A protein has these predicted regions:
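Charged/polar, solvent-exposed surface patches and flexible loops
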Residues: 31-35, 77-81, 102, 155, ...
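ATP-dependent carbohydrate kinase catalytic cores
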Residues: 94-168
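ATP-dependent adenylate-handling ligase core
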Residues: 18-21, 85-88, 141
Length: 168
């Protein structure tokens, strides 16, 4: 998005389609994805009404959310307040969410955070040996990332091993 050489790769019905097109904004890129999903030639759904909800991967929840959330004006504002914790990714995530909300105003949106999986760590594991002020004022702590992948892999591993949640 916003660079030369943008493309959308889409595979449907065993056929791969590559659309080379400038995508100067998140909104234009998401519109291209949505148009492709419903296109007569390469689509996989007949209409946008078939999309019941949209899930968004969001980098950082800080300590604000401990699980996935429904995205509302209020929860998005909280996500934005955590942007300083992930300055390279968080704003881009929120820009994509805003574009989806504009293009799909009646479709529920859900935020799934990279960091929530790791929020169960005890304080001795996530706190650094620094003055408490740094933790409280600047949110300096270990957060952990790629939590949605870790959650999935650990669930599949538990299933494979025949163990329930929380078993060791």
């Amino acid at each position: 998005i916003g660079i030369d050489g943008s493309f959308l790769k889409h595979k449907a019905n065993g056929k791969e389609v590559v659309i080379n097109m400038p995508m100067p904004t998140h909104k234009e890129a998401i519109k291209l994805v949505l148009d492709t999903l419903v296109s007569k030639e390469n689509g996989v759904i007949k209409s946008m009404d078939e999309i019941d909800a949209v899930g968004h991967r969001i980098l950082h929840s800080g300590e604000s959310f401990t699980s996935s959330i429904v995205l509302t004006d209020e929860t998005i504002a909280v996500c934005d307040s955590n942007s300083d914790l992930g300055p390279l990714h968080q704003k881009a995530n929120l820009t994509g969410i805003a574009a989806c909300r504009e293009l799909m105003p009646n479709t529920p949106m859900v935020g799934v955070f990279d960091t929530t999986f790791h929020l169960t760590m005890p304080d001795y594991a996530y706190r650094y040996a620094l003055p408490t002020e740094y933790y409280e004022k600047y949110k300096v702590r270990r957060y952990g990332f790629h939590g949605s992948s870790h959650r999935y892999v650990s669930a599949v591993a538990r299933e494979y091993l025949g163990q329930g949640k929380g078993e060791k």
